[in-house]
Amino acid sequence: MRIEEDLKLGFKDVLIRPKRSTLKSRSDVELERQFTFKHSGQSWSGVPIIAANMDTVGTFSMASALASFDILTAVHKHYSVEEWQAFINNSSADVLKHVMVSTGTSDADFEKTKQILDLNPALNFVCIDVANGYSEHFVQFVAKAREAWPTKTICAGNVVTGEMCEELILSGADIVKVGIGPGSVCTTRVKTGVGYPQLSAVIECADAAHGLGGMIVSDGGCTTPGDVAKAFGGGADFVMLGGMLAGHEESGGRIVEENGEKFMLFYGMSSESAMKRHVGGVAEYRAAEGKTVKLPLRGPVENTARDILGGLRSACTYVGASRLKELTKRTTFIRVLEQENRIFNNL
């Protein structure tokens, strides 16, 4: 047993210090990034925000809606090959270039993903997603995927420490997904005691990944556009959002009605709700590590997307970053004990 004495920080523990700026307007800020990925060699340009691969967020409808904002969607792994074919038949190449194909690590997952990728060459992203990215089996699967799809851009996770981030990049991942336990409907930290404050995880993993020419996506922990800005400020190349994009018309959650008011169910992918839906229930050897919440319907996702992008542009103007790429270089975090004046929050 050992104890690390260094303080680890989440988004709630810091604010970004403002700096002098020559920008005249938020409209002067360029949010689009251009990347060339280490292993695939593929180039991509767009706004580096990703809708999470949850079946109540990462839907085909979400992908179509967010593509118009140049935002990516990691489509959840529970669609059939036939459903993928129908989506591809009704989608433009511009939409498909904003789509990630999600997969688990079983042999069946691998074969299904292979079939999906064969449907259309415009599908360039694979998102290999497990709750615990520290297993040797997972590392071996990433290497297997890289060998099978040498020109596809592979995103793999989740991990929270630099050495495992390096391991995944060396095994073939272009982008490493960072985050264990910070999600709004994730209960891993309270069920297992395992986790890592998200901002510190992002800072440490970004440093490790960038040293090898890889990239990271901060996955989880964002509750406001300001948190998205902090993730980019901490060095994230991409930011993945779940709860912030849940509850919309495109989110795909089941709608329930209580006392005449409609709500949409949103649940973690290791929750009892998810396991009942996809694998018949919670196995006797494990515990559910997610919860289910009822969200008031939030309308079309375009309004939320505009709010997030607007907040991000504003953050850049406060520190004098004319491009999103510059935000991390212009960011100085200050530790704080409060984030906002909450006097009217309950009204």
UniProtKB/Swiss-Prot annotation:
SMART domains on file: IMPDH
EC number(s) on file: 1.7.1.7
Keyword terms of this UniProt record: Metal-binding, NADP, Oxidoreductase, Potassium
Family from the record: Belongs to the IMPDH/GMPR family. GuaC type 1 subfamily.
HAMAP family, A to Z: GMP_reduct_type1 (MF_00596)
Quaternary structure annotation from Swiss-Prot or TrEMBL: Homotetramer.
Protein name (Swiss-Prot/TrEMBL): GMP reductase
Higher taxonomy: Bacteria, Pseudomonadati, Pseudomonadota, Gammaproteobacteria, Enterobacterales
